[in-house]
Every structure is written in structure tokens, then in C-alpha cells.
Swiss-Prot record:
It is found in: Cytoplasm. Tetramer of two alpha and two beta subunits. Pfam families: DALR_1 (PF05746), tRNA_synt_2f (PF02092). Its main location: cytoplasm. It is an enzyme of class 6 (ligase). It catalyses: tRNA(Gly) + glycine + ATP = glycyl-tRNA(Gly) + AMP + diphosphate. Its EC number is 6.1.1.14. GO terms for cellular component: cytosol. One of its GO terms (molecular function) is ATP binding. GO terms for biological process: arginyl-tRNA aminoacylation; glycyl-tRNA aminoacylation. The gene is glyS. It comes from Neisseria meningitidis serogroup A / serotype 4A (strain DSM 15465 / Z2491). Belongs to the class-II aminoacyl-tRNA synthetase family. This is Glycine--tRNA ligase beta subunit.
Length: 687
């Protein structure tokens, strides 16, 4: 059957830039899925998504003009129940009537179990035009649009008003109606650079015609690549590097249809303002690309992406420089104003900054942070007074002009203002770094002082918010407690601190009776659960479960234990020892009395005597290896007792009739279990 390329384009008003690429990809995928389900393509649809500020489009290869005819078999009642006394039963008559057939038209087929009556017929395939309207409308309804709008007198809704619809199969218009628009083959190009209406001659020529006649690079991916290449080329020419993330590049790509990268600049005196402020202003407010020199310092040059191409771009450059100058002047003003007051003098204002009405203001938080940070610093062997001072100043920049304008700079501006106030560099850095890690993969605080304040901040948040009942759910975590827990865990995996003790310290910093009394135990369990999630990114679930079953309170050796268990699992004896350990644990659950020391005089059989001797020899080796942090050696030592363990279970009845003998054998197994599980609960391996 002959196939051709299908093109669908929705011509819109300017689409939301941050959502554009996602909308384009979803629309294209939904159309392709609809064509596949309608069997208008063979196999998986081969398609290209297009998305620019004023259009969403999809181009699908090898689309049929008509569905293939299908043989349909409708199965009815069993032959045995369909005829009675030579006459059709009501069941058979009802089936024939429902199928639109006469009884003599029915055939008999086997359904895999029995013979049944069936009606077989050929369903003629539908034309593309009969199916496409529903496919497009379904694709539009599936789009991830949080808010829709109406336009004019239309009752239709979409993310933005839609003014044109192209539906072409090859060079032929497919007549459909979508969002109140009749399909055609005409569209508009660039708002300023094109000469008006463009007639798309063929579905295959869409991208080329849009580029040549419309001055529109319709492909989001192609525009993005072109912008990135141009930015990098301009930066190399200036011996600089572009300061930009993927999100900014995506947003700028969504704002232009014909990207032109231009170089501009600003006055050097603005560089006296902390570069983080200037970079944020350029990126966030103006969508510009700042440039950094070889030392990572901001230059007074930047790159912008224009949606216009002119012979003389100087007026575009000057206009953008003028707008940026006003923005940078504001930042400069805020910076100078903030320097008129020290961070210390700003602290009283924190009383008016409510953190949560149940646990007080930021000023009250500061009191708690100081005590927690000092406690942690002592445990780390760091300067407790410095940690307390850093915690005292940590939130002071929240009431500065600069942070009021750019909340993203909290901590960063605190660092600069602390330096200007004469605080030590260690304290200034701690003020900034106490927010770290802000997200998964973010760097950790560099010093012990900064770590103490960062831990204090996150612990106080976790314990306080949890304690007033704002516990994270599967879909809600407004105070980012999961993120706080992850940050705490990552820091504690570098330092040998007791996580439960730190949680209790944070809990004790709140007024008595303010928080739920179960908070320490509940948050400790929450931390264990988050630790499992974190570790399962790098280790199998059974290995993580084995290590965490010991409920480690110090996390600095957890990774070493995971690595040791992973190595142990590869030993030939591992599976048998894990099974034996599980058997031991099941037997110990049956103990009637408290387990104690082994009475050597009650050992009767050679197998239990041999196991006792092996356990005796094993104990000091494992204890020494664990004390030295050599967990792999501790686990590998277990392989040496496998013969004695096997012989014991083959030849000894643990639950002997003699109560004293039974208790003694359970005591022996308990001693063995302590050694087998010194590093991890190996019974969980393989589960």
C-alpha cells in the first residue's frame, strides 16, 4: 500500500517558553501513538517533533491513506448449547441478531476449548481523513497543560489561542476540524522577517520551506544546537567560557524562531558587585549568557540571542545594553545600601520573619541553630565558638535588600557581607555553605564549621517540621524534608557522628512539649528509610537491606560495609552461610529462656564441640577486623566455619529433649549468629 509523509501544524500565539519543548514532544508522540493504534503506519511510527514560539508540529513518515481491510471473527455461544431439538436457542438467535447476520451466515470455529458459533466478515479499512480528526483532538487533550484559556467567542480551550491548522498527507490537504479550525496548507513564518503567508507544498518540504521562506527554524533541537554552537564559538573568540545551564539554553531556544547570537557589554564598575548577583540578573531577568575569564571571573562582556537578523545589529546590542545597565544599577544600589548595616545589627529584624507559626520566627530558629551547631562542632573536633557565630549570622541576609530582590542569593550574600563586617573567612564561608547540599549531587560543605551549621540547619528543619505533624506524604513535601534528610545523610557518611544522638540534640533544642514526643524515633526511622533509597542507587537491594538491618548509627563506614558484603556475596560459601544464618535466626526465635554463655561441659556431640571450637577461634579475628574497619576480612573469615556449620546442622538436633542441652545449643548458635552478623545480617542476601 502506498504511503506518504503526514504533516500536522498548530499555529498559535506565543507559547509558554518553559513548557514549549515538552508540549512539542508530547503532541508529536500522542499523534504517532494514535496513528499506530489506528494501524495507519506499520510498526512504530517514525516521526519528527517541531516546536517554536508560535507553533507545534509533527511530521510522520510512511502514513497510509487508508487502513488495511481486516478479517473480523465474532465468537458466540458454544455449539453444544446453541441448538435444542433441531432449533436455534435464544442465545444463538440473540448472537446472530447482535452481529447483524442471519443464522445461516454463521460458521463454527474452535476457540481453544470447544466449538462455538462465529460470524466472520471483512471490515473495510477507513480512510485517513475519517480517523485523523479524532487522533489530533485526542493528542491535544493529552497535552500536559496546567492552565488553559479561551479566545474570542470560541468555546475551545488551549494553552494559547490557535489561529491556523495544517494537515497534509504528501501534498494533499486532509480535511479535518480541530479547535474550531478547518485544516489547510497555509501558515505564517517569522513575525518580522518573513513576507507573510506561506503555502506548504508537501509534508516533506515543511522544515525547508519554513527556513527558506519563513525564516523559522522549526525544530527545537536544531535551534538549540545552533545557539549552543554559536555561543561557544563567540566565547572561544573572546578566550572566555559561557556561564549558562541547560534550563537557560532551553528557555532561550523557546523564545526565538531565527536565533542570532550577538556580543554586548557593560561598564566595568559594575564588576565591584558580587558576580553571583550580576550573573543572576543577566540570566534570570534578561536571559543573557554571561562570560567568565580563564580564572572563572565574570567579564564585562556577555552574549545575547536575538530573534532578528539585521545588516547592522548595533541598535539591538545598544538596546539590550541599556536595559541591562538599569538592572545592574539596581543590583549595585542594593549592594551599597546593604553595606550600611552589619549582619549582627540586622538580627532583631529576624523576629518579624515567620518560619512557621507553630515553631516561631527565624530569630527563634537562630537560637536553636547556635546550640545545635556548637554541639556538632565539638563532636567534630572543630571550633564550637566559630560554629555558633556562623549559625548566629546564617540567616541575617534574609532581611537584606539584595536577598529580598533575589532570594536565590541567600547565603551567598551573607558570605560577602560577613567578609565586609570583618568576620573570619571560615565563618563567612560557613554562612554561605550551610545551605549545602541544596539538591542531589550538590557539593557538601567544605569545612567542619560549615558542616556543623549545615547539619544544624537541616536537623532543626527536619525535627521541627516533623514534630508539628507536617510529615511528608507520597505526593506532598512542602518543607522539603526528604531533601533535608538526604543532605544530613550525605554529610554524616563523611563523619563518624551518631545520627540518633544528633536527632535527639535537635529535638531538645525546642521548648519542652512543643513537638510530638515520638518525633526522635519517627525521624530516625525516616532517616533509615531515606538512607536505603540513597544507597540503592549504587548497590543491590539485598545488600543494602543486610547492612541497614543492623541499624547503623554511624554512617561513615556504611559504604565500606556495603562493599565488603558485595565481595562476600561472590564467595562460593556465601549462599550456604546466608541460608545457615537464616536457619539459626529461626531457631533462636524458639528459645524459651534468655540466651547466655555456652557451657562447654554440656556439649555432647563431636559436631557441636567442633562448631564451638571454630566459633571460639573466629571471635577474636572478627572483633579485630571490625575494630580496624576491615569489614571484608571479617566477612571472609566466616567461610572458614562453613564445614563445621554444615556438620552441626547435619548431625545435631538443636531442640533436644533435655532442656539444658537444648538451651546450651541455642546459646552456641546465638554466639555464632553474633559473629556471622557482626557486619551485616547476611541472612537477607539473595532475598
Amino acid at each position: 500500500m502506498m504511503t506518504q509523509t503526514l504533516l500536522i501544524e498548530l499555529l498559535t500565539e506565543e507559547l509558554p517558553p518553559k513548557a514549549l519543548n515538552n508540549l512539542g514532544n508530547h503532541f508529536a508522540a500522542a499523534v504517532a501513538e494514535g496513528l499506530e493504534k489506528a494501524q495507519l503506519v506499520d510498526g512504530a511510527a517514525e516521526y519528527t517533533a517541531y516546536a517554536s514560539p508560535r507553533r507545534l508540529a509533527v511530521q510522520v513518515k510512511n502514513v497510509k491513506a487508508v487502513q488495511a481491510d481486516q478479517k473480523i471473527v465474532k465468537k458466540g455461544p458454544a455449539v453444544a448449547n446453541a441448538v435444542k431439538d433441531g432449533a436455534p436457542t435464544k442465545a444463538l438467535e440473540g448472537f446472530a441478531r447482535g452481529a447483524g447476520a442471519k443464522i445461516e451466515d454463521l460458521t463454527i470455529v474452535h476457540d481453544g476449548k470447544q466449538d462455538v458459533y462465529a460470524y466472520e466478515y471483512v471490515q473495510t479499512g477507513k480512510l485517513l481523513g475519517e480517523l485523523l480528526e479524532d487522533i489530533i483532538n485526542a493528542a491535544v487533550k493529552k497535552l500536559p497543560i496546567p492552565k488553559v484559556m479561551r479566545w474570542g467567542s470560541s468555546t475551545f480551550t488551549f494553552v494559547r489561542p490557535v489561529h491556523g491548522l495544517i494537515v497534509l498527507h504528501g501534498g494533499d490537504i486532509v480535511n479535518v476540524s480541530v479547535l474550531g479550525l478547518q485544516s489547510g496548507n497555509k501558515t505564517l513564518g517569522h513575525r518580522f522577517l518573513s513576507d507573510g503567508e506561506i503555502t506548504i507544498e508537501n509534508a516533506d518540504s515543511y522544515a525547508e520551506q519554513m527556513r527558506e521562506q519563513g525564516k523559522v527554524v522549526a525544530s527545537f533541537a536544531e535551534r538549540k544546537a545552533a545557539i549552543q554552537t554559536a555561543l561557544e564559538g563567540q566565547a572561544r573568540r573572546l578566550n572566555a567560557a559561557v556561564a549558562a545551564d541547560e534550563a537557560l539554553l532551553d528557555e532561550v531556544t523557546a523564545l526565538v524562531e531565527w536565533p542570532v547570537v550577538l556580543e554586548a557589554g557593560f561598564e566595568e564598575h559594575f564588576l565591584a558587585v558580587p558576580q553571583e548577583c550580576l550573573i543572576l540578573t543577566m540570566q534570570q531577568n534578561q536571559k543573557y549568557f554571561p562570560l567568565l575569564d580563564q580564572n572563572g571571573k565574570l567579564m564585562n562582556r556577555f552574549l545575547l540571542v536575538s530573534n532578528l537578523q539585521t545588516e547592522d545589529p548595533s541598535h539591538i546590542i545598544q538596546g539590550n545594553e541599556r536595559v541591562l545597565r538599569a538592572r545592574l544599577s539596581d543590583a549595585e544600589f542594593f549592594y551599597k545600601q546593604d553595606q550600611k548595616a552589619t549582619l549582627e545589627s540586622r538580627l532583631p529584624k529576624l523576629s518579624g520573619v515567620v518560619y512557621h507559626n507553630k515553631i516561631g520566627s527565624q530569630a527563634e530558629r537562630i537560637e536553636r541553630l547556635q546550640s545545635i551547631a556548637a554541639h556538632i562542632a565539638k563532636a567534630l573536633g572543630a571550633d564550637a565558638a566559630a560554629a555558633e557565630r556562623a549559625a548566629r549570622l546564617a540567616k541575617a541576609d534574609l532581611v537584606t535588600e539584595m536577598v529580598g530582590e533575589f532570594p536565590e542569593l541567600q547565603g551567598t550574600m551573607g558570605k560577602y557581607y560577613a567578609r565586609l563586617d570583618g568576620e573570619t573567612e571560615e565563618i563567612a564561608e560557613a554562612v554561605e555553605q550551610h545551605y549545602q547540599p541544596r539538591f542531589a549531587g550538590d557539593k557538601l560543605p567544605e569545612s567542619k564549621i560549615a558542616t556543623a551549621v549545615a547539619l544544624a540547619d537541616k536537623l532543626e528543619t527536619l525535627v521541627g517540621i516533623w514534630g508539628i505533624g507536617l510529615i511528608p506524604t507520597s505526593d506532598k513535601d512542602p518543607y522539603a524534608l526528604r531533601r533535608s534528610a538526604l543532605g544530613i545523610l550525605r554529610m554524616l557518611m563523611q563523619y563518624g557522628l551518631d545520627v540518633n544522638e544528633l536527632i535527639q540534640t535537635a529535638f531538645d533544642s525546642f521548648p519542652k512539649g512543643l513537638l510530638n514526643e515520638k518525633t526522635p524515633s519517627e525521624t530516625a526511622d525516616f532517616m533509615q528509610a531515606r538512607l536505603a533509597v540513597l544507597l540503592q542507587n549504587d548497590y543491590p537491594q539485598d545488600i543494602v537491606a543486610a547492612v541497614l538491618a543492623k541499624q547503623p548509627r554511624r554512617l561513615d563506614d556504611v559504604v565500606a560495609k556495603l562493599q565488603a558484603v558485595a565481595s562476600f556475596k561472590q564467595l562460593p560459601e556465601a549462599a550456604a552461610l546466608a541460608a545457615a544464618n537464616k536457619r539459626v535466626q529461626n531457631l533462636l526465635k524458639k528459645a524459651d529462656a534468655e540466651l547466655g554463655v555456652v557451657n562447654e561441659s554440656l556439649l555432647q556431640q563431636d559436631e557441636e564441640k567442633a562448631l564451638f571450637a571454630a566459633a571460639q577461634g573466629l571471635q577474636p579475628k572478627i572483633a579485630a577486623a571490625v575494630a580496624e574497619g576491615n569489614f571484608q576480612t571479617a566477612l571472609s573469615e566466616l567461610a572458614s566455619v562453613k564445614p563445621q556449620v554444615d556438620a552441626f546442622f547435619d548431625g545435631v538436633m538443636v531442640m533436644a529433649e533435655d532442656a539444658a542441652v537444648k538451651q546450651n545449643r541455642l546459646n552456641l548458635l546465638n554466639r555464632l549468629a553474633e559473629q556471622m552478623n557482626a557486619v551485616a545480617d547476611i541472612a537477607l542476601l539473595g532475598e
